[in-house]
Amino acid sequence: MKSGSTPVDRLRQALSDADAVVIGAGAGLSTAAGYAYSGERFARYFSDFEKKYGFHDMYSGGFYPFPTEEERWAYWSRYIWINRYQNAPKPVYDDLRKLVEGKGYFILTTNVDHCFQKAAFDKKRLFYTQGDYGLLQCSQPCCQETYENEVIVRQMLESQGYVIGEDSSLSVPEGVTPKMAIPSELIPHCPVCGRPMTMNLRCDDTFVEDEGWHR
């Protein structure tokens, strides 16, 4: 390769020459894809929580000690939906997949937003070590099981007044103020032991590593 080649040129050539590629991906890749956790996107969905509780980004809100489970799940249902069930605003993951098409590849990621799967990467070549926004687990694990949450999260959002579009967009009818709590009957409980459930995210030693995690 010519000495004056750019880093992008060298990367392109390295990818072309490689028989196999290992991809390591963290939060920066999803940020590049438009999953901003602060600023306008945060204000669009969480301005009411910001005003009441004083945190200024989604990540900080995820650790806030909400006074009730009803409020906690109102917050988390919005958080989960826009970062897991809505498509990324920019096609960064699709572009990455095109770069490695036809090659052997393996992905190791700490991201929990399911973007690799939504971009049609082979799940068998993917290890997402920190969990998935789309899964729930027992808060005091009585078993190593996780449970898909799309249906219950949708119900939580609709109970707050949101309308979910065919493209998974969230909107509120004119004159409606979103509620900041869900009905108590929508709080998820473990089907095995009855304890409250939580997200399947690695934040402490209660993280459940289910069968899919170990494959």
Model segments located where?
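Conserved catalytic alpha/beta core of Sir2/sirtuin-type deacylases, generalized to analogous enzyme cores
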Residues: 1-215
